[in-house]
């Protein structure tokens, strides 16, 4: 997917979960909106290079959005977790996710389940079972190992319960971990951070829920990030 026009700055601090202060090259201080409400472990330390977009909306209190971080080790992370669904949709449309490539119809944000949920994507195909796909963002990486979650996620636990129920009804059910960090080539669940989520995911796999994680690649033009896209399946370590 193509990124909007981005500007760079130096990260000063993140606070109140949704906000971050950055310094431009000319010394001006800006406050950015941060769409990622997680712990963002290792995704933004003071002094890192931040890339942000600017909205034309006149109603937004904070028109600038934190999009990416270039870490001191040279790796890049997409901070805007709203991009994960856009990335996944593009990958589904382009048949990049080979495990789901046989489906022709992609329905986003469909209400389902018994806990007042919405599935990220409902896939349909001729003579195929309906496939419920829940997308999660992977931004937490240690030693080239992608981890999810980076904080306790009761919402994620609810989604797993819903997927287990869909599988028991005869549908396909998938948890899709979309890489937003280009530094990992394997994936696992962060048991030490959310043991309840880890236990539920293990149960889901036993019930037949499918787990896939895909890596991400960033394109640059003249040292400026211009696009990102999902590339290939990475190993899932149970």
Swiss-Prot record:
InterPro entries: SfsA, SfsA_C, SfsA_N. Disulfide bonds: none annotated. Signal peptide: none annotated. GO terms for molecular function: DNA binding. Transmembrane segments: none annotated. Pfam families: SfsA, SfsA_N. Belongs to the SfsA family. NCBIfam families: sfsA. HAMAP family: SfsA (MF_00095). This is Sugar fermentation stimulation protein homolog. It comes from Histophilus somni (strain 2336).
């Amino acid at each position: 997917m193509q990124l909007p026009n981005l500007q760079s700055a130096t990260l000063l601090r993140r606070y109140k979960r949704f906000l971050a202060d950055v310094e431009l090259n000319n010394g001006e201080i800006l406050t950015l909106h941060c769409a990622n409400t997680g712990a963002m472990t290792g995704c933004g330390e003071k002094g890192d290079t931040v890339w942000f977009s600017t909205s034309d909306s006149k109603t937004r209190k904070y028109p600038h959005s934190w999009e990416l971080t270039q870490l001191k080790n040279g790796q890049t992370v997409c901070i805007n977790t709203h991009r994960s669904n856009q990335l996944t949709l593009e990958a589904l449309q382009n048949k990049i996710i080979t495990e789901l490539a046989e489906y022709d119809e992609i329905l986003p944000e469909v209400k389902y389940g018994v806990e007042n949920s919405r599935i990220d994507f409902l896939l349909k195909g001729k003579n195929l079972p309906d496939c419920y796909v829940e997308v999660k963002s992977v931004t937490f990486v240690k030693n080239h190992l992608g981890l999810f979650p980076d904080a306790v996620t009761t919402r994620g636990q609810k989604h797993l319960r819903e997927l287990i129920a869909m599988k028991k009804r005869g549908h396909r059910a998938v948890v899709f971990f979309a890489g937003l960090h280009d530094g990992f080539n394997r994936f696992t669940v962060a048991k030490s951070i959310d043991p309840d989520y880890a236990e539920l995911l293990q149960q889901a796999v036993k019930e037949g829920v499918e787990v896939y994680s895909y890596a991400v690649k960033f394109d640059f033009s003249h040292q400026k990030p211009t696009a990102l896209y999902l590339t290939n399946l990475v190993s899932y370590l149970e």
